[in-house]
Design a protein with these regions (language model features):
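Cytosolic regulatory regions built on CNB/CRP/Popeye-like sensor folds
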Residues: 1-182
């Protein structure tokens, strides 16, 4: 995965009508209020963040592109960052008995890699790109250096993980139920 500067056209794929240089200094990083509101609504990890705080958070992101077929990271890699998809699609996979099992298919607005921020820094799954990706990468130290943003992001990570745990519990109950019936 290679860091890249993103021109306004790429940012526009993520949020319509953006007219900003995303790599500009925080003080000059500006987005239209309607775009900020759209990002807060469509990207759960930023939900509840003030507009000013969101602009500051977006300004510290590293913008990355990854081609279809490539891996973003492998299960058991050490992680210190999470990603927000701007465009493209990834599969989240775990290896079981030597075979990749797909856990989720994620697209624009979804985040991944967040468990490394709240857990033991070890990636819990492999993330494989199925359609060329442009993503924002946020490093733990930059998030933690900004307590107001960190509080909102970690709260939203907790909500996202709780939702995923609920979905996993339902699947597990279904599997156990099917097993008991046979």
């Amino acid at each position: 995965m290679s860091p890249m500067k993103v021109d306004p056209a790429l940012v526009q794929m993520f949020a319509e009508n953006v007219r900003a240089e995303v790599m500009a200094p925080v003080s000059s990083f500006k987005l239209e209020p309607a775009i900020i509101e759209k990002i807060k609504k469509k990207v759960p990890i930023f939900s509840g963040m003030s507009s000013d705080r969101l602009m500051r958070t977006l300004a510290v992101a590293e913008y990355c592109s990854v081609k279809a077929g490539e891996l973003v990271f492998n299960e058991r890699d050490i992680g210190d960052s999470f990603f927000v998809l701007m465009s493209g699609e990834v599969l989240v996979e775990k290896l079981r008995n030597g075979k990749a099992v797909t856990l989720a298919r994620l697209n624009a607005g979804h985040c991944f890699g967040e468990m490394a921020l709240v857990g033991n820094h070890v990636r819990s799954a492999t993330v494989r790109v199925t359609r060329d990706v442009v993503a924002m990468r946020f490093y733990r130290d930059l998030i933690d250096a900004n307590p107001e943003s960190a509080q909102v992001i970690y709260r939203n990570i907790a909500c996202i993980l709780a939702s995923r745990l609920g979905e996993s519990s339902e699947l597990l109950a279904d599997l156990v139920g099917q097993s008991a019936a046979t």
